[in-house]
UniProtKB/Swiss-Prot annotation:
Cited Gene3D superfamilies: HUPs, Tyrosyl-Transfer RNA Synthetase
Residue sites binding ATP per the record: Q11, P12, S13, G19, N20, G147, E148, D149, V186, K195, M196, S197, K198, S199
Entry protein name: Tryptophan--tRNA ligase
Species per Swiss-Prot/TrEMBL record: Salmonella typhimurium (strain LT2 / SGSC1412 / ATCC 700720)
Motif window: 'HIGH' region: 12-20
Species classification: Bacteria, Pseudomonadati, Pseudomonadota, Gammaproteobacteria, Enterobacterales
Binding-site positions, L-tryptophan: D135
Length: 334
């Protein structure tokens, strides 16, 4: 029986965080045995905001090494860089012609990013969801792991696929969202009602996977809790968002359940909780960073992973693009 195809990706434009790891990358790793996983470093999406060329190249290799350090295995999964497979951009252009201006105008992420990057509201930023649809549909993807911030984009991908299929027959699989049962939603350290984001301007809100352990300890000790007197370590996202976030992080790292942790910290101060979280996170990151540096220093291996991954991805992508071009009436290349 053929395994269902899973597609996901991350931009190389910012350092990945513990939120990316606990909420997504760890799930990607766990899916490798049961699914045919295709994981992409989406460098073409990254240039919708201005990038320094040298930094983008470095960040792409850094991200690849982090994928590997987190446990994504090139023997089990297809790992590649988006710009190495030209079919992404080719299908993206074709799908532009089956996507309505009004649909893109309603995308909340475009509104957010255009407010943030007001000096560079480019067509690529507006068109980003169509390239994302191409990324997904190119591989006849069955399942897409999505967070809250990408649900709207996946809905658009489904709409485009159904519209195209309605015109030309069953060219595309219509992808379904995959929402893992487990996976911590890690929030900002100082603003625990919003999700931790690698693009946050306030770096005290964020813990990067490559961050120095001393810096990690400092940030966690400064994390927002609350002013309850006496302090109560209790899981209550609405009333105690900061404490709940720290409990979520500790649970994700140690595997202990929230009720177990509540019992462990009964009658203790918030400082005790922060100390345990800091120790657990810095320990986890030390091990991950050791693996990261081993991969990052082996450039020949990284080049091989990229080359092999692009070849595997291209073979599958070419089949889909051929079917699309034939359906819309392009003359086949002699």
């Amino acid at each position: 029986m053929t395994k269902p195809i899973v597609f996901s990706g991350a931009q190389p434009s910012g350092e990945l965080t513990i939120g990316n790891y606990m909420g997504a990358l760890r799930q990607w790793v766990n899916m490798q045995d049961d699914y045919h996983c295709i994981y992409c470093i989406v460098d073409q999406h990254a240039i919708t905001v201005r990038q320094d060329a040298q930094q983008l190249r470095k960040a792409t290799l850094d991200t690849l090494a982090l994928y590997l350090a987190c446990g994504i295995d090139p023997e089990k999964s297809t790992i590649f860089v988006q710009s190495h497979v030209p079919e992404h951009a080719q299908l993206g252009w074709a799908l532009n012609c089956y996507t309505y201006f009004g649909e893109l105008s309603r995308m909340t992420q475009f509104k957010d990013k255009s407010a943030r990057y007001a000096e560079n509201i480019n067509a690529g930023l507006f068109d980003y969801p169509v390239l994302m649809a191409a990324d997904i549909l190119l591989y006849q993807t069955n399942l897409v792991p999505v967070g809250e911030d990408q649900k709207q984009h996946l809905e658009l991908s489904r709409d485009i696929a159904q519209r195209f299929n309605g015109l030309y027959g069953d060219i595309f699989k219509v992808p379904e969202p995959f929402i893992p049962k487990s996976g911590a939603r890690v929030m900002s350290l100082l603003e625990p009602t919003k999700k931790m984001s690698k693009s946050d301007d306030n770096r005290n809100n964020v813990i990067g996977l490559l961050e120095d352990p001393k810096s990690v300890v400092k940030k966690i000790k400064r994390a927002v809790t609350d002013s309850d007197e006496p302090p109560v370590v209790r899981y209550d996202v609405k009333e105690k968002a900061g404490v709940s976030n720290l409990l979520d992080i500790l649970s994700a790292v140690t595997g202990q359940s929230i009720p177990e942790l509540e019992k462990q910290f009964e009658g203790k101060m918030y400082g005790h909780l922060k100390g345990e979280v800091a120790e657990a996170v810095s320990g986890m990151l030390s091990e991950l960073q050791e693996r990261y540096h081993r991969f990052r220093n082996d450039e020949a291996f990284l080049q091989k992973v990229m080359k092999d991954g692009a070849e595997k991805a291209s073979a599958r992508a070419a089949e889909t693009l051929k079917a699309v071009y034939e359906a819309i009436g392009f003359v086949a290349k002699p």
